[in-house]
UniProtKB/Swiss-Prot annotation:
Family the entry assigns: Belongs to the cytochrome P450 family.
Gene that produces this protein: CYP11B1
Membrane topology: Peripheral membrane protein
Pathway membership: Steroid biosynthesis; glucocorticoid biosynthesis; Steroid hormone biosynthesis
Functional summary from the UniProt entry: A cytochrome P450 monooxygenase that catalyzes the biosynthesis of aldosterone and other adrenal corticoids. Differing from other species (such as human, rat and mice), it is able to catalyze three sequential oxidative reactions of 11-deoxycorticosterone (21-hydroxyprogesterone), namely 11-beta hydroxylation, followed by two successive oxidations at C18 yielding 18-hydroxy and then 18-oxo intermediates, and ending with the formation of aldosterone. Steroid 11beta, 18- and 19-hydroxylase.
Protein name: Cytochrome P450 11B1, mitochondrial
Catalysed transformations (reactions): a steroid + 2 reduced [adrenodoxin] + O2 + 2 H(+) = an 11beta-hydroxysteroid + 2 oxidized [adrenodoxin] + H2O; 11-deoxycortisol + 2 reduced [adrenodoxin] + O2 + 2 H(+) = cortisol + 2 oxidized [adrenodoxin] + H2O; 21-hydroxyprogesterone + 2 reduced [adrenodoxin] + O2 + 2 H(+) = corticosterone + 2 oxidized [adrenodoxin] + H2O; corticosterone + 2 reduced [adrenodoxin] + O2 + 2 H(+) = 18-hydroxycorticosterone + 2 oxidized [adrenodoxin] + H2O
Protein EC: 1.14.15.4, 1.14.15.5
Pfam families per record: p450
InterPro entries: CYP11_CYP27_families (IPR050479), Cyt_P450 (IPR001128), Cyt_P450_CS (IPR017972), Cyt_P450_E_grp-I (IPR002401), Cyt_P450_sf (IPR036396)
Keywords in alphabetical order: Heme, Iron, Lipid metabolism, Membrane, Metal-binding, Mitochondrion, Mitochondrion inner membrane, Monooxygenase, Oxidoreductase, Steroid metabolism, Steroidogenesis, Transit peptide
Transit peptide feature range: 1-24
Subcellular location: Mitochondrion inner membrane
Cofactor entry: heme
The species this protein was found in: Bos taurus
């Protein structure tokens, strides 16, 4: 415990001045008696149609998180942001998140990702919960939760993830020990991406792709390329209404559809294989989420496929980038890294005997992941289309308004997190039982929180556990990494890492 408390931390980006900290406290200014009309809310400057045109021209909005963060500092903790014909409200205080959650209906509404929806409509595929709103969303979500998000489900698939994480560590160790110095400097990002795909497909479909081997099979590589192409084209299509982009970006739409075609073909083959195996007799061992859903038999095959594909598509970048940023922060904060490593070494025997114990035996490592996601939230906003009139920061919010919580600004608000520029995992352990009820929001809140949350958490936790107990992780890069928004928040570049084997 003493080692944790005295671990030195390095700065992690710009922070608000004292004046700005007072402006953006955990609570807004004392509200006047009369609620102010929606039209009186501070508005992000600029022409809403020119803003949309600029986004389309650039086919991205890479600095959106920084632009919105700056706007909060200029306008206060709430403002309107209009793009084209859509009115949005941005907030960044925990109290407003709490009010949004209290106002949640039985089926909270959120924006639908147009490129993904367009593909499914054109091909006649069903939509999974990621692309649904309303009663159908709730029905499917309640049927998925027991086999994906529940603690009993987590206990079942944790050993599968542990096997992949151990293989990753052993493969890396073999490469490191080929060097006489017992160390290796490399770009670890491709290997981490392969790990997340390997682990996720095993949890979902119960099969290994062989991506951690020296020569992965061509089908597995084609699957990776399809996922990469789908995500890249999503970024370039998501910012402009479909009615405009369909004739302005025809090549990109073709690439998007071809990538999805391959992903659906892969999922079809995998699900049919599982279905045929079950038809011959129930497996005597746990063999993944899809098998559990098929055996439960309360969803159609098309619905299972739709939701499995959503989980597949959403399980790669969103897990890989937090892993890489955690390695980066631990590499440039060696005393924090040593404290986390010591925790893993102490718990290793118990986790080796029962991998499920990693969830309870590694509190500091879990706190490090929370700290990474505080500073670098993969999804920079949480959103709700409010179903009834609401008051936020004493402004009237009409029903049907899209409200976005900017996690990037919430996580860097000094009135919410002391010294927010510091990478300090211990803060999450000190805060237990006190402070805001909603400090960790990277996976959303309420009934619409991320369905794949527990899969992602255990994949990150076990990989870091096995890597840190076997290697010292170092980097020469000590400056902050520039983060860009491309559908998710990601590093524009990543430094090389040196892995030194621990004898």
């Amino acid at each position: 415990m003493a080692l944790w408390a005295k671990a030195r931390v390095r700065m992690a980006g710009p922070w608000l001045s004292l004046h700005e900290a007072r402006l953006l406290g955990t609570r807004g200014a004392a509200a006047p008696k009369a609620v102010l009309p929606f039209e009186a809310m501070p508005r992000c400057p600029g022409n809403k149609w020119m803003r949309m045109l600029q986004i389309w021209k650039e086919q991205s909005s890479e600095n959106m998180h920084l632009d919105m963060h700056q706007t909060f500092q200029e306008l206060g903790p709430i403002f309107r942001y209009d793009v084209g014909g859509r009115h949005m409200v941005f907030v960044m205080l925990p109290e407003d998140v709490e009010r949004l959650q209290q106002a949640d209906s039985h089926h909270p509404q959120r924006m639908i990702l147009e490129p993904w929806l367009a593909y499914r409509q054109a091909r006649g595929h069903k939509c999974g919960v990621f692309l649904l709103n309303g009663p159908q969303w709730r029905l499917d979500r309640l049927r998925l939760n027991p086999d994906v998000l529940s603690l009993p489900a987590l206990q079942k698939y944790t050993p599968l993830v542990d096997g992949v994480a151990r293989d990753f560590s052993q493969t890396l160790k073999a490469r490191v020990l080929q060097n006489a110095r017992g160390s290796l400097t490399l770009d670890i990002a491709p290997s981490v991406f392969r790990y997340t795909i390997e682990a996720s497909t095993l949890v979902l479909y119960g099969e290994r792709l062989g991506l951690l081997t020296q020569q992965p099979n061509p089908d597995s590589l084609n699957f990776i390329h399809a996922l990469e192409a789908m995500l890249k084209s999503t970024v370039q299509l998501m910012f402009v209404p479909r009615r405009l982009s369909r004739w302005m970006s025809t090549n990109m739409w073709r690439e998007h559809f071809e990538a999805w075609d391959y992903i659906f073909q892969y999922a079809n083959r995998a699900i049919q294989r599982i279905y045929q195996e079950l038809a011959l007799g129930h497996p005597w061992h746990y063999s993944g989420i899809v098998a559990e859903l098929l055996m439960r038999a309360d969803m159609t095959l098309d619905t299972i496929k739709a939701n499995t594909i959503d989980l597949t598509a959403g399980s790669v970048d969103t897990t890989a980038f937090p892993l890489l940023m955690t390695l980066f922060e631990l590499a440039r904060n060696p005393e924090v890294q040593q404290a986390v490593r010591q925790e893993s070494l102490v718990a290793e025997a118990r986790i080796s005997e029962n991998p499920q114990r990693a969830i309870t035996e590694l509190p500091l490592l879990r706190a490090a992941l929370k700290e990474t996601l505080r500073l670098y939230p993969v999804g920079i906003t949480l959103e709700r289309e409010v179903s009834s009139d609401l008051v936020l920061q004493n402004y009237h919010i009409p029903a049907g308004t899209l409200v976005k919580v900017l996690l990037y600004s919430l996580g860097r608000n000094p009135a919410v997190f002391a010294r927010p520029e510091s990478y300090h995992p211990q803060r999450w352990l000190d805060r237990q039982g006190s402070g805001s009820r909603f400090p960790h929001l990277a996976f959303g809140f309420g009934v619409r929180q991320c369905l794949g949350r527990r899969v992602a958490e255990v994949e990150m936790l076990l990989l870091l556990h096995h890597v840190l107990k076997n290697f010292l992780v170092e980097t020469l890069e000590q400056e902050d990494i520039k983060m860009v928004y491309r559908f998710i928040l990601m590093p524009s570049t990543l430094p090389l890492f040196t892995f030194r084997a621990i004898q």
